[in-house]
A protein has these predicted regions:
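Acidic, His/Gly-rich catalytic cores of divalent-metal-dependent hydrolytic chemistry
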Residues: 115-130
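Long, structured stretches of catalytic cores involved in phosphate-ester chemistry, encompassing
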Residues: 1-119
Length: 131
């Protein structure tokens, strides 16, 4: 099964706040060691998805690390992006929702804006196996 974790301030971000840096890095390292698949955050008023990254912001050699989603698109005033950090793969400046499906061995996502358009979507394998 997939391991999903949620907290408020993202470790990585293209936004004004530029992520939480050193404050969350030790927790990210722990989650990575425990096989976390997804980290959901808000705080920034936009949608952003990253490649799987280690606590230092690098893609792991084996591709196995948590993938962060920043989803602060629930209705507050949106604000723009700064220069996207390394490995930011999708950015949407529209109100909307993130739909996740956690299934045996994989997860999928769709970011749907308020007009009903799918603005980002994908599928990935889970890191952990559960009996």
């Amino acid at each position: 099964g997939c391991l999903l974790v949620m907290w408020h301030t993202p470790l990585y971000s293209s936004g004004f706040h530029r992520g939480s840096g050193d404050k969350m890095r030790p927790l990210w390292q722990l989650l990575d060691r425990q096989g976390a698949d997804l980290v959901l955050s808000g705080h920034e008023h936009f949608y952003e998805r990253f490649d799987p990254l280690d606590a230092e912001g690098r893609p792991p050699g084996d591709g196995q690390a948590p993938r962060q989603f920043v989803v602060g698109t629930g209705g507050a005033r949106l604000y723009g992006f700064w220069k996207p950090p390394y490995r930011s793969q999708a950015r949407v400046l529209e109100h909307g929702v993130l739909q996740l499906a956690l299934e045996r061995g994989r997860y999928s996502w769709r970011f749907i804006d308020v007009a009903g358009r799918v603005r980002d979507a994908g599928v990935a394998r889970c890191r952990r196996t559960m009996n």
